[in-house]
């Protein structure tokens, strides 16, 4: 009988490529990973790994075994969810990951609702960048998380994980309002938009092609979104400041130090002192992520329900099409 824990190691090796990466991700020593994979090889009765210089490569038999391992591990997640549902009451830890704007604007109310409905649950929140969620879920560091994607930044394929839509939000071009010391004023963006009729996105962005831009740090989805949106409008942004916190981004914009693209939840409201907000046609889509098979787990389902009940009025009901 093949050992499930060793199958998990083989699956991680298929994803990460090296024994060292598997060891680091799962907090094992490389020698322990090699030893357990050797035992799995004996259990299988076939070679699973081929040496390639300093690394290893999966044999065709191992690749086939990984496909079966994916199905087995998903079924185990479902079994765990059904067992949890059969127990009376929800209790125990629920490890939650969320990105900063959701952590500020939505998660506190959701956790308060969850505590009222299920006092036996112990939610544990970690602020987590969406780019790190897949690893944290697979490693068992999180049970459920919020991730987001933007126009121009497609969702990556994440085998073994499932996502469900939560909400969409509008995106805005933030520019300094007209006034003393404002070099890049709102006047360049044209007439003020209405919620139902935003201006042409390319025109709004091109109006500030010569402005200094404020983006998130490279490697983040927010950075890629801004750069690709500008490129689609026909120019590359001249990035001067790299800041991840949207409150700081808006403070820099208000000081006349540049322009930026920000999501709806990244603003305190439609009126930001010193900042002109121009709605764009692009959106940010937020989804609930969990390991495949775990969606029916009562704790995960309860948190998802609390999230939906906590959505601000401007976002409520928008998840179905996200």
Placement of each model-derived feature along the sequence:
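Secondary-structure junction motif
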Residues: 148, 181-187, 193-233, 296-305, ...
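Short helix-boundary/capping micro-motifs
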Residues: 12-29
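Beta-alpha-beta core module
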Residues: 155-165, 169, 247-295
